[in-house]
Amino acid sequence: FKRDNNLDYAANQIVTSTGAKQSIANVVLCLVNPGEEVLLPIPYWVSYAAQVELAGGTIVEIPTKLENQFKMTAAELDSAITYQTKLLIFSSPCNPTGAVYSREELREIAEVIASYDDLYVIADEIYEHISYGEKHESLAQFDFIKDRVITVNGLSKGFAMTGWRLGYIGAPATIAKACVKMQGQFTSATCSIAQRAAIAALTGTLEPTRKMRDAFLERRNLILELLNDIDGIKTYVPDGAFYVFPDISSYFGKSDGTTTINNANDFCMALLNNAHVATVSGSAFGQEGCFRISYAASTDTIKEAMRRVKAYLGTLA
């Protein structure tokens, strides 16, 4: 936190967990009471909604626009807040869109949050090292709301340590203490072997991470070039993560003679069954009309996958 985000936390403000997903679940279960509202900008990572439901919270979705890279504006956030709102969960860089919030955008969001009492934020920053623009910006950098921000991170994305399962939070001490109690009823401490591996990752050079990021950038540029060559797909330039989230609604109502594409689920199943390319429907992320493609694959695989997608979509009428 100090090296990469210039955030100062005492030891009692840090909690390590079995992956960032558990870190988020701990916070949601500690903060959200039944019936309280949790704001989720659409599209959102699938686990956010499920965890809110487990806590008995009420999900309030905030629609966003492809033209704005699916980023929530401060005005959109402000209009969604009610007296029942307890928590906002958002990610930057974002899964599934790859959207990255700028410092100014985060400041505007922070000012809205500061204007409401007892509103907390989970800032999921798991993809912080896979950002293609300027340096990553953390919401908790703004001191006037730091005591209401829970910053979540982990080792799986920036250090390619998915199987080691280690995530962590920086949070107000009272929330961190509650998360320790909550986690103690599920998994207790994080695997000691994974913690040793994490020390090596966090204290070592970031050069391997930078090389990985540069490789993802090349793949992003490649997949955008290939997607832009397919009629009917509308996309944008994602600034982080390793996903793109195109709009494919122009294909709805079309058929290959056997299957009719009525929604994003149909679209993705048709690609799987006919082109043998696996993607994820936007409905899984709360955003009908789009689908997610991961470019965490070799350039050869990306080229072949996009060739198959283009060929199949060419059969639709």
Q: What role is predicted for each listed range?
A:
Residues 2-317:
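PLP-dependent class I/II
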